[in-house]
């Protein structure tokens, strides 16, 4: 089975079991950390990812590490290990290991166990009155639903004060202590100090108690899980964050909020986000606070919905990152929410905008419980309000709770739309126009062999809507893999947008098109040799 095909499973809290059993089973393929492993950032570690064809992740890597290094963490589900070098090891030693291990069979990637940070911007001492729920029209949504407690939002962040006066009633009691602590590797995600406020504040925005005569109004009354992956200082390791994402999906979270970023592109984090998306979870993340810089990861991954920040006047926040990955905008400047201990404060950052969008997603899913994650994502796009910013600043627009709840996802918000747009060629069924291209090649190993071929393909139909890339290789004795990019860059085995890699030499990738893509294709030899035929079928409407 390929990993690039989204399953779009509708999550309806599939693991609502007894607390202790739910917590035990929820850790699935996440191995315990080595005793004594320091929490938080892990600059001395290298993460090594392996092919999903191997039977044991740890055994595959163990024989390939230097004698002064050790495997300190394993995640069999995501297929990676963390290899720790001594703190006094030369930087070049780690770089040499990353380069050399990539030459080994079944090794997919090697990268630093980077540090990600909370995306909070320090606020002024003057705090404005709460405005975020009003800006996204929560009142109209609340007339229909305050949020269903069967809808679960997992907050991957610092710990949440789960007994906070305005959060306790919305914590998901199906899991012991309402979550898991990946920083300290224990079952209690409670914050360790009063200053560890970020997770409590973010959680209070998405699912703080509403209409309960207490404190502030959160966006929704959906249930909430705390996946503590960032430590007291606001930083967290790549492996802890990836494990927290996987765990959240395995717990049945419908929505994962990630108000964090800053570590750059990571195969491990990309795989974790794609894993959760394939499990049916909608992932929402903060765009970043680099004052107009490019969208940070994990928000920039295809599987994640990136959210920019607005101020009270619906202008783009000065700190907000922008770019083509932005899908929604939401209020993020001076947002009032809960903080430790049973207190309240206003904070600013795309960290605050992301949980607003996550909370609206929770309201929408409460009103339309049959939606898959893909359908929910599209519905939030369709019901967003254009506030006059550029696409790179607002994406589809400012998220709107009332429209997301009251608009029928099947019919849209205007019954006359179909009649008005009958002549729009983009509204035809996908497949009215077809273009097919083929190429033949041969791959072989050894000295002077040809281990891979690359191709580029420009869309040619009037309104491209779908493409299928098919690789037909030798019937036996060879294993070929197929990689695809959507922006014209040349794909590699570590830089791609879609991939298909099975045993054997026949692969296929299907992708929906918006019309502005240019396909880059890599046919790569994993084992064996032989001839192949590459076929691209483009459909237009």
UniProtKB/Swiss-Prot annotation:
Q: Which residues form the propeptide?
A: 34-121
As for subcellular location, the record says: Secreted
EC number(s): the record gives 3.4.21.-
Catalytic center residues: 157 (charge relay system), 198 (charge relay system), 351 (charge relay system)
Regulation of activity: Dependent on high salt concentrations for activity and stability. Strongly inhibited by the serine protease inhibitors diisopropyl fluorophosphate (DFP), phenylmethyl sulfonylfluoride (PMSF) and chymostatin. Also inhibited by denaturing agents such as SDS, urea, and HCl guanidinium. Activated by thiol-containing reducing agents such as dithiotreitol (DTT) and 2-mercaptoethanol.
- Catalytic temperature dependence: Optimum temperature is 60 degrees Celsius.
Query: Where in the sequence is the signal peptide annotated?
Result: 1-33
Induction section of the entry: Expressed and secreted during the transition to the stationary growth phase. Is probably up-regulated in response to factors (metabolite and/or regulatory molecule) occurring in high-density cultures.
Give the residues annotated as coiled coil.
Answer: none
Q: Which GO terms describe its biological process?
A: proteolysis
Task: Summarize what the UniProt record says about post-translational modification.
Answer: Exported by the Tat system. The position of the signal peptide cleavage has not been experimentally proven. After transport across the membrane, the propeptide is probably processed autocatalytically, yielding the mature fully active protease.
Query: What PROSITE patterns does this protein's entry cite?
Result: SUBTILASE, SUBTILASE_HIS, SUBTILASE_SER, TAT
Function summary: Serine protease that hydrolyzes large proteins such as casein and gelatin. Cleaves preferentially at the carboxyl terminus of Phe, Tyr or Leu. Is also able to catalyze peptide synthesis under different salt concentrations in the presence of dimethyl sulfoxide (DMSO).
Record-linked PANTHER family:
CEREVISIN-RELATED, PEPTIDASE S8
Family stated for the protein in its record = Belongs to the peptidase S8 family.
Subunit composition and interactions = Monomer.
Question: By what name is this protein known?
Answer: Halolysin-like extracellular serine protease Nep
- Organism whose genome encodes this protein: Natrialba magadii
Gene name, Swiss-Prot/TrEMBL: nep
């Amino acid at each position: 089975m390929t990993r690039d095909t989204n399953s779009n499973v509708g999550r309806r809290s599939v693991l609502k079991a007894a607390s202790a059993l739910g917590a035990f089973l929820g850790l699935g393929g996440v191995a315990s950390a080595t005793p004594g492993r320091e929490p938080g950032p892990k600059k001395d570690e290298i993460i090594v990812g392996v092919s999903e064809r191997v039977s044991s992740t740890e055994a595959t890597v163990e024989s390939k590490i230097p004698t002064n290094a050790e495997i300190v963490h394993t995640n069999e589900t995501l297929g990676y290990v963390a290899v720790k070098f001594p703190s006094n090891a030369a930087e070049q030693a780690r770089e040499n290991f990353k380069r050399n291990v990539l030459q080994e069979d079944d090794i997919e990637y090697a990268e630093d166990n980077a540090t990600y940070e909370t995306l909070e911007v320090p606020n002024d001492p003057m705090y404005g009155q709460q405005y975020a729920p009003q800006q996204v029209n929560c009142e109209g949504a609340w007339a229909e639903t305050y949020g269903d407690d069967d809808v679960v939002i997992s907050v991957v962040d610092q710990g949440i004060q789960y007994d906070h006066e305005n959060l306790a009633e919305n914590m998901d009691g199906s899991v012991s202590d309402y979550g898991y602590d990946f920083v300290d590797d224990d079952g209690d995600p409670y914050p360790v100090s009063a200053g560890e406020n970020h997770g409590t504040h973010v959680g209070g925005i998405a699912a703080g108690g509403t209409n309960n005569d207490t404190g502030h109004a959160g966006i929704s009354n959906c249930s909430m899980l705390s996946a503590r992956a960032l430590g007291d200082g606001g930083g967290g390791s790549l492996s802890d964050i990836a494990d927290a994402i996987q765990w959240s999906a395995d717990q049945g979270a419908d929505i994962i909020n990630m108000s964090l970023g800053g570590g750059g592109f990571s195969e491990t984090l990309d795989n974790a986000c794609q894993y959760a998306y394939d499990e049916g979870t909608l992932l929402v993340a903060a765009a970043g606070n680099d004052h107009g810089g490019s969208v940070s990861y994990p928000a920039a991954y295809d599987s994640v919905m990136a959210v920019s920040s607005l101020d009270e006047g619906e202008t783009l926040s000065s700190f907000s990152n922008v770019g083509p990955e932005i899908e929604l905008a939401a209020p993020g400047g001076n947002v009032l929410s809960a903080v430790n201990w049973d207190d309240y404060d206003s904070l600013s950052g795309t960290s605050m905008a992301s949980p607003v969008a996550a909370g609206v997603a929770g309201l929408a899913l409460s009103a339309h419980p049959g939606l898959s994650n893909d359908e929910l994502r599209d519905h939030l796009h369709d019901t967003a309000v254009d506030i006059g910013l550029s696409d790179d600043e607002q994406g589809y627009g400012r998220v709107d709770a009332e429209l997301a709840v009251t608009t029928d996802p099947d019919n849209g918000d205007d019954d006359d739309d179909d009649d008005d747009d009958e002549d729009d060629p983009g509204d035809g069924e996908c497949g009215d126009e077809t273009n097919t291209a083929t190429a033949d090649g041969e791959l072989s190993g050894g000295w002077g062999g040809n281990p891979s071929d690359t191709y580029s393909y420009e869309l040619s139909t009037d309104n491209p809507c779908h493409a299928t890339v098919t690789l037909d290789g030798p019937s036996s004795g060879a294993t070929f893999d197929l990689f695809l990019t959507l922006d014209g860059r040349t794909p590699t085995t570590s830089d791609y947008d879609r991939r298909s890699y099975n045993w054997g030499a026949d692969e296929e990738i299907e992708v929906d098109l918006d019309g502005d893509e240019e396909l880059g294709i890599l046919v790569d030899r994993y084992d064996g040799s032989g001839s192949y035929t590459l076929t691209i079928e483009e459909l237009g409407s």
